[in-house]
């Protein structure tokens, strides 16, 4: 896997439950991502505590020297928090080093939000 051509080796891997979920013998999903040497797209919810959780996982990603393509802020059906406020706080905390995209609860795959996310991934792989 280490000697692959990025343009010919794009795979999607979903790590449900978070990057620190144990998978075997003290290994986590984050360890697997490091071993596979794959970039990340992180999907986070818009809930009380999501900012802290997101910043914590980014610190772990940085400590593992992994590439992060972007963060997707996902609006929940029962959102009581303003997703725009969460987006602003994330962007202020991260600066311009990491792209933050949001997906509204009524978005579909043809929406501008999904196009932006796909564009980020294509740009990362120089396609």
Regions found by a protein language model. Give the residues of each.
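Phosphate-binding/switch loop-helix module in NTP-utilizing enzymes
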Residues: 1-23, 30
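Inter-motif core of Ras-like GTPase G domains
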Residues: 24-47
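Anionic group-transfer/hydrolysis microenvironments
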Residues: 16-17, 47, 76
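Charged helix-capping and loop-helix junction motifs
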Residues: 24-31, 55-58, 83-88
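C-terminal lobe/tail of nucleotide-utilizing enzymes
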Residues: 59-127
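Class I SAM-dependent methyltransferase SAM-binding "motif I" and its flanking Rossmann-like core
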Residues: 50
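Structural motif
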Residues: 12-14, 41-43, 72
């Amino acid at each position: 896997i280490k000697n692959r051509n990025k343009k010919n080796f794009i795979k999607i891997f979903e790590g449900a439950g978070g990057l620190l979920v144990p998978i075997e013998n003290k290994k986590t999903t984050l360890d697997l991502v490091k071993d596979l040497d794959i970039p990340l797209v992180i999907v986070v919810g818009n809930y009380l505590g999501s900012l802290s959780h997101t910043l914590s996982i980014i610190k772990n990603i940085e400590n593992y020297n992994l590439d992060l393509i972007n963060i997707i802020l996902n609006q929940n059906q029962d959102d009581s928090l303003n997703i725009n406020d969460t987006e602003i706080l994330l962007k202020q905390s991260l600066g311009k080093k990491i792209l933050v995209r949001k997906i509204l609860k009524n978005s579909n795959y043809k929406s501008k939000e999904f196009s932006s996310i796909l564009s980020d991934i294509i740009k990362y792989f120089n396609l």
